Amino acid sequence: MKRALERLRQLPRANERFNIFNSVNLSAAQQVMPSEKPLGNLVVGIKDNIVTKKLPTTCSSGVLAGYMSPYDATVVELLDEAGAVTAGKTNMDEFGMGSGGIHSFFGPTLNPAFPERPTVAGGSSSGSAAAVAAGVVDFALGTDTGGSVRMPAAYTSTVGFKPSYGRVSRHGVIAYAQSLDTVGIGARDVGLVRRVFEVLDRHDPKDPTSLPDELRQQAAALRREKKHLKIGIPAELLHGSVAAEIRERLLVVLDKLQAQGHELYPVSVPAVKNSLLVYYMLAPAEAASNLARYDGIRYGCRDEDLDMSDEVLFAPTRGKFGKEVKNRIVLGNYNLCSGAFKNNYMKAQKLRVELINQFDSIFAFENICTGNKPNPAGVDVLLSLTCMAPPPSLEAFTSKENKSPVNSYINDVFTVPMSLAGLPCISVPLAGMKGVGIQLTAQFADDYGLLDAAEDVMQEQLN
């Protein structure tokens, strides 16, 4: 109880400095009481695209300013039942679109790991990662579409876990791209991530993409008896764009793992080279469809100051979207138009399937969804970097993105492939390099095996 109250006491000052929360639960301290529940008195931050009855849900967008949901998301209900105390709704890139945490109606989130200068916290779950890094929550929920939990975790030197697609309910999560969106968990250590995941890992009949119980039973059989891991190092995710200093630190970690008996193998997933292209064909197309509902009638609000008498009815509402969201709506609608649908969208779907099949071919476990046969000589996990470099300053990131939005899209190059395949991934801090993460990836549904491996990697870095 004392620790929870201390975190909540520090919250206003941290929020003022780093712009972490869009709204704060003013009664949180009164909710701290003796508890023996699984997450009793653990303080949590909820990303502002996960609906809550008692706090506004805005997606950091002017379109949803002040919106109050009539219900709680399933994950919020589960956390409440487990005894967690909600501190507030965390800042984010508008509707989850961005990798820097700067595209917010409420202003950019700053990185508590770099207090000496204004530095980006990563996106889109910027506020969730910043809340963990600032020490004002024990853990936070984010959403990961193409790296939105893992990238901020790397930039803030915290842990960010994206479960397998379908393991955690999306009911009550405001969609960006529904075939990719996954609720993720951020914390300081893997052990706490595991505790939270155990609470959230269950079938939800309200979510049509929730993994059914029969597949969860198959997933429970994915257990390793051996102590040492076979670790694959994907050649496509360790290229020349990575700074020499980061490569050197990564090699130190690999040497330590090998010294402890883990086996390292070079592997190749050639389809990774198409991942960014595929992602930006599919995700904006889904976003364009999802955001069409914000018409000022069912959802959203109208800008009464605009004289749009000669324009379309919904223009005053659509005008409240930020620049990045507008860019992706335009791109998504183009990819869905008659001329581009066959050449862009459908080809991207085929390339996505090819990527999934190639990932399946290098893992020792089978993919319980695709039915692809396991590779007896395959690896247990993949190890790569989460990002190419430490986080840039706010000024540098903004300047680079202003020159071309494509510059920021490249930040997702190491995280997007796993999202397209629906694989479980986790980013843990790289020892000796503040603001850089190691990314571990396992076969679909092997989430607990992945968490075991992540604990091993973190422990070996301490030795």
Swiss-Prot record:
It holds the Pfam family Amidase. Keywords: ATP-binding, Ligase, Mitochondrion, Nucleotide-binding, Protein biosynthesis. Its EC number is 6.3.5.7. The active site is at K47, S124, S148. It is an enzyme of class 6 (ligase). Its main location: mitochondrion. PROSITE patterns: AMIDASES. It is found in: Mitochondrion. GO terms for biological process: endoplasmic reticulum organization; glutaminyl-tRNAGln biosynthesis via transamidation; mitochondrial translation. InterPro entries: Amidase, Amidase_CS, Amidase_dom, AS_sf, GatA. GO terms for molecular function: ATP binding; glutaminyl-tRNA synthase (glutamine-hydrolyzing) activity. The keyword Glycoprotein does not apply. It catalyses: L-glutamyl-tRNA(Gln) + L-glutamine + ATP + H2O = L-glutaminyl-tRNA(Gln) + L-glutamate + ADP + phosphate + H(+). Gene3D superfamilies: Amidase signature (AS) domain. The keyword ATP-binding applies. GO terms for cellular component: glutamyl-tRNA(Gln) amidotransferase complex; mitochondrion. Belongs to the amidase family. GatA subfamily. Allows the formation of correctly charged Gln-tRNA(Gln) through the transamidation of misacylated Glu-tRNA(Gln) in the mitochondria. The reaction takes place in the presence of glutamine and ATP through an activated gamma-phospho-Glu-tRNA(Gln). Subunit of the heterotrimeric GatFAB amidotransferase (AdT) complex, composed of A, B and F subunits. This is Glutamyl-tRNA(Gln) amidotransferase subunit A, mitochondrial. The lineage of its organism: Eukaryota, Fungi, Dikarya, Ascomycota, Saccharomycotina. The gene is HER2.
